[in-house]
Design a protein with these regions (language model features):
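Short, Gly/Pro- and small/polar-rich lid/capping loops
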Residues: 1-27
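Generic structural motif
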Residues: 3, 31-33, 45-49
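Short beta-strand elements
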Residues: 22-32, 42-44
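Metal- or metallocofactor-binding catalytic centers and their adjacent structured scaffolds
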Residues: 38-137
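Flexible, glycine/charged-enriched surface loops at secondary-structure junctions
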Residues: 141-144
Length: 144
C-alpha cells in the first residue's frame, strides 16, 4: 500500500522541503517449520528528499522508489529464507537487495542512480513486517 501523509510542519532536507510523504505499508506472511502461519505489517516513509538527495526531479525519484517497492514485494514473496527474522532479513539484503538495486540502476542513466540508502529504506518496511509476523508466532506476545 502507498499511503499519502501530510506533515504537521515542513521538514527541510538540504535544498528541499518536505510537506507530505508517502508511506509504504506492506503485509508479509510467514510459515514456521511446523506449518504455523502468521501475518505481519510494516511501514516506512518514502522520504524522497532524505533517502535520495539529488537534483533529479522529485517525481522521477518518487516513481523509482515506489516501483522499487513493488519489485521488493515480488522478491520477498519469492524469497525462501529460513531462521530468525534477523537472519532472514540479513540474508535477503545479502542475496537479493543488491541485485534488485543493480537491476533498477541498469535501467537508469549513470547520473540518476538510486542510492543504497533508498534501497535499504524501501526494504525496511518488509523487514518490519517480517519481525511483526514472527512476533505473532511467539507465545510471549499477547495481542488480545
Amino acid at each position: 500500500y502507498l499511503l499519502p501523509v501530510r506533515t504537521r510542519v515542513p521538514l527541510k532536507f538540504g535544498a528541499e522541503t518536505l510537506t507530505s510523504v508517502t508511506c509504504a505499508r506492506v503485509q508479509l506472511c510467514v510459515e514456521d517449520a511446523d506449518g504455523n502461519r502468521a501475518t505481519g505489517w510494516g511501514e516506512t516513509p518514502l522520504s524522497v528528499q532524505w533517502v535520495w538527495p539529488n537534483t533529479l526531479s522529485y517525481s522521477d525519484r518518487y516513481e523509482t522508489l515506489t516501483d522499487f517497492c513493488y519489485r521488493l514485494a515480488k522478491a520477498w514473496s519469492e524469497f525462501d529464507g529460513v531462521g530468525h527474522p534477523l537472519e532472514i532479513g540479513y540474508d535477503f539484503i545479502e542475496q537479493s537487495l543488491g541485485d534488485l538495486l543493480e537491476e533498477v540502476n541498469g535501467e537508469r542513466p549513470s547520473d540518476a542512480q538510486m542510492p543504497w540508502l533508498a534501497a535499504l529504506t524501501c526494504c525496511s518496511a518488509f523487514d518490519l513486517a517480517l519481525h511483526d509476523a514472527y512476533g505473532f508466532m511467539r507465545p510471549t506476545i499477547d495481542r488480545t
